[in-house]
């Protein structure tokens, strides 16, 4: 990762390079309120308070989550929790984002919000890795589709190649 062996890199260094968003955002929250959750990664790495506040302000603006700040994470909907999870994993400005089934607990409106976040990350030049069963919302965002089975990449597709697969072939995957 960035020319460094991942196994030889301390976890706190990896945290600044790779952001992650889980299937269930509750499982990645370390705090009970949204402000603390957004600040957590920076505080954990010892960033100065002024830097933390600047990063939070930028992230709140970029992710349009002003209305979610100052709230209990327990009072948020699934989509709102996912927005906070995406924002908190972005506050350190990692170049790589890893998402595990990010749409699984979301309704259509929240999936559209997730698409907007993914589009923002793509515009920012981030590498985005997504393990996902719902693929329709990723249609015009992906550069490559990898079919992984039993922990191995079995096939790589361009978006056009993947789109040309029959429904039955996709279902067999």
PLM ranges: what are they?
Residues 97-100:
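Catalytic Walker B motif of ABC-type/P-loop ATPase nucleotide-binding domains
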Residues 86-87:
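Hydrophobic anchor residue at the start of the ABC signature
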Residues 1-13:
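ABC ATPase NBD Q-loop/coupling interface
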Residues 72-76, 80:
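Conserved ABC ATPase signature
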Residues 132-133:
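H-loop/switch region of ABC-family ATPase nucleotide-binding domains
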Residues 50-68:
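Conserved ABC ATPase "signature" region
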Residues 152-173:
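Conserved beta-strand-loop-alpha-helix hinge in the C-terminal portion
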């Amino acid at each position: 990762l960035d020319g460094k062996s991942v196994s030889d890199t301390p976890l706190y260094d990896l945290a600044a390079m790779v952001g992650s968003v889980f299937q269930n955002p509750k499982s990645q929250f370390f705090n009970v309120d949204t402000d603390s959750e957004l600040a957590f990664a920076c505080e954990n790495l010892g960033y100065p308070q002024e830097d933390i506040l600047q990063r939070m302000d930028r992230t709140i603006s970029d992710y349009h989550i002003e209305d979610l700040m100052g709230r209990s994470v327990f009072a948020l909907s699934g989509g709102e929790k996912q927005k906070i999870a995406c924002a908190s994993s972005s506050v350190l400005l990692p170049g790589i984002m890893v998402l595990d089934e990010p749409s699984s607990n979301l309704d259509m409106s929240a999936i559209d919000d997730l698409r907007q976040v993914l589009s923002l990350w793509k515009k920012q030049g981030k590498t985005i890795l997504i393990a996902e069963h719902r693929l329709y919302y990723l249609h015009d965002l992906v550069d490559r589709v990898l079919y992984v089975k039993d922990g191995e990449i079995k096939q790589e597709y361009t978006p056009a190649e993947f789109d040309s697969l029959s429904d039955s072939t996709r279902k067999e995957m």
